């Protein structure tokens, strides 16, 4: 909210509530992209720590996690209403503290400039996915390790990325 409406901090709570109510009332699907469930299960089976750093509020995040039956996959989750908003890196710092992972051993996977800027500001390696919010051109500005065109390409890249200890998904 600080990024979108910096001039009206007194309205942030009411805007978030209105957005959340509208999103819930009009959401047709909280499913993941095809292949994400398999990817997450594979990463977890490798012993990696998985985390979520989202712009959603806790209510929205919990709804998605419940619908996708993925509670067991994530070591920690952070929602926008629990910490500073993206692109402030505090959300990622909190995740690293909880997991005990060094920033160099983590990677942020994101589909928006806010995700990649947040990781860049912290010095965290980052991967863009070009099938989400922002275009490849926008994501490229944040110097990601790669930009995956689809989930299969992301999965293939992560298999070869040896220094991984934790994965943060946005």
Language model feature labels by segment:
Residues 1-24, 34-44:
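A metal-dependent, Asp-based hydrolase signature
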Residues 29, 57-108, 113-122, 136-140:
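Substrate-recognition "cap/lid" segment bordering the active-site pocket of phosphatases
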Residues 45-48, 98-105, 161-165:
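Glycine-rich phosphate-binding loop signature in dinucleotide/nucleotide-binding domains
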Residues 25-52, 58-65, 89:
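Short, acidic loop-to-helix structural element flanking the phosphoryl-transfer center
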Residues 124, 143-144:
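As written
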């Amino acid at each position: 909210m600080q990024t979108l409406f910096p001039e009206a901090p007194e309205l942030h709570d009411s805007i978030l509530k209105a957005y959340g109510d509208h999103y819930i009332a009009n959401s047709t699907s909280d499913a993941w992209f095809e292949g994400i469930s398999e990817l997450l299960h594979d990463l977890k089976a490798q012993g990696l720590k998985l985390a979520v750093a989202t712009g959603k509020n806790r209510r929205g995040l919990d709804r998605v996690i419940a619908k996708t039956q993925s509670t067991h996959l994530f070591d920690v989750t952070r929602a926008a209403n629990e910490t500073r908003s993206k692109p402030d890196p505090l959300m990622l710092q909190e995740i690293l503290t909880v997991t005990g992972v060094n920033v160099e051993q983590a990677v942020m996977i994101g589909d928006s400039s806010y995700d990649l800027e947040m990781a860049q500001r912290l010095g965290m390696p980052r991967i863009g996915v070009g099938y989400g919010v922002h275009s490849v051109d926008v994501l490229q500005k944040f110097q990601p390790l790669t930009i995956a065109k689809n989930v299969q390409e992301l999965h293939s890249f992560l298999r070869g990325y040896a220094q991984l200890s934790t994965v943060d998904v946005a």
